[in-house]
Amino acid sequence: MPYYWGAILIGGVFLAGCTQNQETTTTQSGSKENVIKVGLLVDLSGGLATYGNNEKHICEIAEEKINKYFEEKGMPYKVKLYVEDTRADPNICLQKVQALHAQGITFFLGPMASGEVKNIKGFINSNKIVIISPSSTAPPQMLGFRTPEEKKYVFRFVPTDNFQGNAIGDVAKQLGLKNVIVIYRKDAWGDGLERATVEKLKANGINIIDEIPYDPNIGDWSPIIQTTTNKIAGKGNDTGVIFIGYEEVATLLSQIDDNSPLLKHVWIGCDGTANSKKVLEEAKNKAVKVKLYSTMFQSETDEAEKIKEEFKKRGYGEPDQYALNVYDAFWVGAISYAEMLNKTGGKYDADLLSKLIKENTVKYSEGQFGVKSVTGYIKLNEWNDRASGNYGIFAVTEDGWKLVGVWDSTTGKINWK
């Protein structure tokens, strides 16, 4: 922590009024403690539930550590999480944001899906709410942002799908595919990733047999299955299926006949399918057959191993990359919010908070606050999105999901494990 700020806080000079978005409580020692409310928008029961539950659990761990940090530094703050299940539904997400904002919450972690970000951006900007999403990856233009200024309250600690599209295209090439059928989720995120992926596939000389969109609320996959089966008929091993969507891929696979020719071809997924628990629970045998090679942003430090170990000890299993992203986001957001309150005498200032998050992301990455990043150096571009990153390639095996390779964003090469 910068000395000048820490000295003010530790020296007891800090004075803060109670604003709508914070509560003031009295500790056992009689000192005043300002509670910073943090909204957590995650999918706990929808198409991204595997990742949403991971984010909830890791934020609970972060909440404990941040509060301990504030206490040890003599800083009169405490963060308090307000968790809401959005089901990755844009309309539900907006309702949750509005409800939490009515409770005075002005800083949010999430939401997870790009369609959600797109749907709440108007409310975010008009009410000057600041958010950090760990997993929204659609390019800004696909979300309706025309300039970086319009997106100054929306941060994303993950690279956009311009990177992931390249990764998927290179995976297809490395696997020897010459022809592909692309099945994609018809929403802001799916459209963006599909466009970026197809562009890279074509650049790699891969023929696009068909591009098949599906409704995010789909239940019966039989029309998609029939169309894909007809398109792939008579094709050899150099033909594959690319699925751009969420964990509903498990339902799709489960509805495919055991003897279907679709299960004789390689499938490639994305970050919406990588490490999905639902896939293992509902369609593991079929997923093993098609491999379901899935890409996900990959950036971990030695510090991440400590958090992952604690995550496992609590019975939560293995945290995914987006859980690690939101862990870092919570730290940066909490430190920045506290600094904002210190600078304003306890008042909320969205423009200052936005500025501090951008600055403190660098300081946090460099360890200036005495806390180590779990996802490595976080460099943000002019749109407040993570500027670069490698992608892990995961596949379904008899032993579950396994990391089988890493795509290097600087070289475009894949290091297969």
From Swiss-Prot:
InterPro entries: BCAA_transport, Leu-bd, Peripla_BP_I. Keywords: Signal. Coiled coil: none annotated. The keyword Ribosomal protein does not apply. Residues 1-21 form the signal peptide. This is Uncharacterized protein MJ1266. It comes from Methanocaldococcus jannaschii (strain ATCC 43067 / DSM 2661 / JAL-1 / JCM 10045 / NBRC 100440).
